[in-house]
Curated annotation (Swiss-Prot):
GO molecular-function term, one example from the UniProt record: mRNA binding
Protein name: Small ribosomal subunit protein uS3
Keyword Ribosomal protein carried by entry: yes
GO biological process, one term: translation
Keyword terms, alphabetized: Ribonucleoprotein, Ribosomal protein, RNA-binding, rRNA-binding
Superkingdom of origin organism: Bacteria
Regions annotated as coiled coil: none
Keyword flag Ribosomal protein: yes
Family that this chain belongs to: Belongs to the universal ribosomal protein uS3 family.
Organism name: Helicobacter acinonychis (strain Sheeba)
InterPro entries hit by this protein: KH_dom, KH_dom-like_a/b, KH_dom_type_2, KH_sf_prok-type, Ribosomal_S3_C_sf, Ribosomal_uS3_bac-typ, Ribosomal_uS3_C, Ribosomal_uS3_CS
Job of this protein: Binds the lower part of the 30S subunit head. Binds mRNA in the 70S ribosome, positioning it for translation.
Length: 234
């Protein structure tokens, strides 16, 4: 099962959190979901140059707060905060609401799965050999402290007539282990031959709750009674 499903969705509530954090009612849920989708599409398009890894949307009463996690936050803020104000005005025009935006920096961009997937997609659009692009991203992630990386590309690779899937993996990527911290990213490369899908899994180590310790079970050897002789009494 771990090989098929989205590893982030599988670990929600264990070691991953939701990216849309609000409590809906039956009346407001559809409009909130539609708004979240519009906000994400707008920010991804407008801030693509900044390397956006994650967009977290929080709602409390009538307040709407958006947190953008990016590799280059300085490009989003701009000189004296001019660029961030333009983004706020664009969101206000889009959803007709006041929005507060927080910017966070990705500490290790090379070990971020979403940024790695977008990096591979960008290289494929520039006609870089797909194997070279995949291996380059994997090496960068491992150097940044990742314990395992898996990259998969699907489509008309190298302009082939028949679409196929190829993948490479280095290190450990335990998708079935729920306590494993697996980062997942997906991107699409728009090439002249068609769309190529890129998926990246990065294993960053295992996360255990504080206070939980695993005790080694002592082996208990049962003492058996001596076997009775099968021979009859003489």
């Amino acid at each position: 099962m771990g090989q098929k499903v989205n590893p982030v969705g599988l670990r929600l509530g264990i070691n991953r959190n939701w990216t849309s954090r609000w409590f809906p009612s039956a009346r407001t849920a559809p409009s909130n979901i539609d708004e979240d989708n519009k906000i994400r599409k707008f920010l991804k398009k407008e801030l693509y140059y900044a390397g956006v890894s994650q967009i977290v949307i929080e709602r409390a009463a009538k307040k709407l707060r958006v947190t953008v996690v990016a590799a280059r936050p300085g490009l989003i803020i701009g000189k004296k905060g001019v660029d961030i104000e333009k983004v706020k005005e664009g969101l206000k025009t889009l959803i007709k609401k006041e929005v507060s935006i927080n910017i966070k920096e990705v500490k290790r961009p090379q070990a971020d799965a979403q940024l790695a997937a977008e990096n591979v997609a960008t290289q494929l659009e520039k006609r870089v050999a797909f194997r070279r692009a995949m291996k380059k991203v994997m090496q960068a992630a491992l150097k940044s402290g990742a314990k395992g990386v898996k990259v998969r590309v699907s489509g008309r690779l190298a302009g082939a007539e028949i679409a196929r899937t190829e993948w490479y993996m280095e290190g450990r990527v335990p998708l079935h282990t729920l306590r494993a911290k697996i980062d997942y990213g997906f991107a699409e490369a728009m090439t002249v031959y068609g769309i190529i899908g890129v998926k990246v899994w990065i294993f960053k180590g295992e996360v255990l709750q504080k206070g939980i310790q695993f005790e080694k079970k002592e082996e208990v050897k049962e003492e058996r009674e001596p076997r009775r002789s099968r021979r009859g009494r003489q």
